[in-house]
C-alpha cells in the first residue's frame, strides 16, 4: 500500500518504461470484464478511526463491491492476529450495548458486518500484512508448518469475524525462494478456504486476493502464472511511482510513460498491466489500484526537475489527502496523454502529484478499454464527496453501480465465537 517507501528507494535505477503516449494500446482482444461486472475495491484502515475520524459507517457502501479491512499481523509461527483489538473488536459505537449477554464482537468488525447486512452486494476481506508487517511473512511462509498455521488462523479469523475472504499484502518477496514460498502460501490458503466452502451450509466460495506490485523489480521476481491459479483477483498497486526517494519530482500514478519528460515517469501502470498479462494473468482479474492521496515535492521548478524536501502533509510529511487538494494558490495541470495530473504553486515552488476527477475518468476508460477487472483505492478516508469523488467518478465511468459485479455476500457464520455475529447481528 502506501507504505512502499523503503522498497522504492531503488526505483530510479530502473530502465525507463517503453514509450506509449495515447490511450489506445496494442493489447490482444480483451477478455470480458469480471464475471457479473466490474469490481470496485477499497482499503479501509483500522487506524483511520483515530485522528482521521473515519469509521466504517462513513463508507458509501453502494459504490463498492469489496472492502479490504487492513491490517492483520503475522507471528513467527504463522499465526495471523488482529493488530488493534480495540479498534477491531472492542470499540462501542452508538447503539452498541455494554450489558448485552454472551460473547459479542463490536468495533469496526461489527460495523463491517452491518454494512454487509444492509448492502448484500458488498463483500469484506481481511487484509493481512501491509508495508509495516510485511517482514513477518518470510519466516512462516518458508515452512509447511508455518504456511498451515497461517492458512488455518486466517481462516478462523474470517469465520469468527464475518469476512468473505482473505487479502494478502506481502511487500515484497525478495528472491526465488520467497517467491516460491508465496505460491505455496497461497495454495495453503486456497485449500483451507475451499475446504470450508465445501462444508459451509450455503456452499459459498470464499475469496483470496493479494495486493500486487506495479514495479518490475518486484513483480519480475514473482511466479505470476502459478499464483494466479489460487487467486480470485489481483489488486495492482499502481501508485507511489515517484516520491521523496527520487532525485527529481515525478508522477506517482501515471498510466502511460511521458515521451516529453521521461524522467518524470520512471514507471507506468500500462507497462505493469501488459507484463502481468504477458506472464499469464487474465486482464479481467487485474484490478487497477489508484491513490486517494498525493505525493509532494518542495523547492522544485516543476515536474521532472530536482527538489529539496517534501514539505508538510495531511497526516505525514509529503503526503496529502485528495480531499485537501488542490491547495490554495496552486495551478492544476492535467496530462491526458499519460493520464496523470499535478498541482504546482510557483510562488512556493511546491508540487503535488495526485489524480484529479478528469484523470480518474481517463483511468476508468483505460479499465474498460482493456477488459480489466475494475478499480481499487488506497484508502477510503481520503476521498471527496459528490461530483468531486474519485471513486464515484470511476464507478460512473465504468457504467455506474449497475455495471458492478453482482455477487451476494455471506451473512451466515455458524462457527463464529461471537454470539451476536453468529446470530446475524439482531437489532
UniProtKB/Swiss-Prot annotation:
Annotated active site: 171 (proton donor)
Residues annotated as domain GH18: 38-401
Gene Ontology cellular component list: extracellular region
EC code(s) of this entry: 3.2.1.14
Residues that hold chitin according to the record: 102-103, 129-132, 172, 237-240, 378
Molecular function GO labels: chitin binding; endochitinase activity
Keyword Hydrolase tagged: yes
A Pfam family: Glyco_hydro_18
Descriptive protein name: Endochitinase 1
Organism: Coccidioides immitis (strain RS)
Gene giving rise to this polypeptide: CTS1
Amino acid at each position: 500500500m502506501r507504505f512502499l517507501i523503503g522498497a522504492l528507494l531503488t526505483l530510479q535505477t530502473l530502465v525507463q518504461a517503453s514509450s506509449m503516449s495515447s490511450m489506445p494500446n496494442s493489447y490482444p482482444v480483451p477478455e470480458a470484464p469480471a464475471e457479473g461486472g466490474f469490481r470496485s475495491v477499497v482499503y479501509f484502515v483500522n487506524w483511520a478511526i483515530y485522528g482521521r475520524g473515519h469509521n466504517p459507517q462513513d463508507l458509501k457502501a453502494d459504490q463498492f463491491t469489496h472492502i479490504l479491512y487492513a491490517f492483520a499481523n503475522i507471528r513467527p509461527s504463522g499465526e495471523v492476529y488482529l493488530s488493534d483489538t480495540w479498534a477491531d473488536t472492542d470499540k462501542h459505537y452508538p447503539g452498541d450495548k455494554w450489558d448485552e449477554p454472551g460473547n459479542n464482537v463490536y468495533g469496526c468488525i461489527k460495523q463491517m458486518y452491518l454494512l454487509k447486512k444492509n448492502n448484500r452486494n458488498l463483500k469484506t476481506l481481511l487484509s493481512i500484512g501491509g508495508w509495516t508487517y510485511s517482514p513477518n511473512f518470510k519466516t512462516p511462509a518458508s515452512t509447511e508448518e508455518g504456511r498451515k498455521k497461517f492458512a488455518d488462523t486466517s481462516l478462523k479469523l474470517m469465520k469468527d469475524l464475518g469476512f468473505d475472504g482473505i487479502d494478502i499484502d506481502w511487500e515484497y518477496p525478495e528472491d526465488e525462494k520467497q517467491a516460491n514460498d508465496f505460491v505455496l502460501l497461497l495454495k495453503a490458503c486456497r485449500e483451507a478456504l475451499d475446504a470450508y466452502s465445501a462444508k459451509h451450509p450455503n456452499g459459498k466460495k470464499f475469496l483470496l486476493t493479494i495486493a500486487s506490485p506495479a514495479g518490475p523489480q518486484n513483480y519480475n521476481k514473482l511466479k505470476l502464472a502459478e499464483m494466479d491459479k489460487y487467486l480470485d483477483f489481483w489488486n495492482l498497486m499502481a501508485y507511489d511511482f515517484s516520491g521523496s526517494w527520487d532525485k527529481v519530482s515525478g508522477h506517482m500514478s501515471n498510466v502511460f510513460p511521458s515521451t516529453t519528460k521521461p524522467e518524470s515517469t520512471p514507471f507506468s501502470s500500462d507497462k505493469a498491466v501488459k507484463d502481468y498479462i504477458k506472464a499469464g494473468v487474465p486482464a479481467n482479474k487485474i484490478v487497477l489500484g489508484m491513490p486517494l492521496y498525493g505525493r509532494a515535492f518542495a523547492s522544485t521548478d516543476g515536474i521532472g526537475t530536482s527538489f529539496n524536501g517534501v514539505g508538510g502533509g495531511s497526516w505525514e510529511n509529503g503526503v496529502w489527502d485528495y480531499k485537501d487538494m488542490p491547495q490554495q494558490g496552486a495551478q492544476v495541470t492535467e496530462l491526458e496523454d499519460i493520464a496523470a495530473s499535478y498541482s504546482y504553486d510557483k510562488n512556493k515552488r511546491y508540487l503535488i502529484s495526485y489524480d484529479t476527477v478528469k484523470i480518474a475518468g481517463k483511468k476508468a476508460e483505460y479499465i474498460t478499454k482493456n477488459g480489466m477487472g475494475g478499480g481499487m483505492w488506497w484508502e477510503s478516508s481520503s476521498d471527496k464527496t459528490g461530483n468531486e469523488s474519485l471513486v464515484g467518478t470511476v464507478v460512473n465511468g465504468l457504467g455506474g453501480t449497475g455495471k458492478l459485479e453482482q455477487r451476494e455476500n455471506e451473512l451466515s457464520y455458524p462457527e463464529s465465537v461471537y454470539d451476536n455475529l453468529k446470530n446475524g447481528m439482531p437489532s
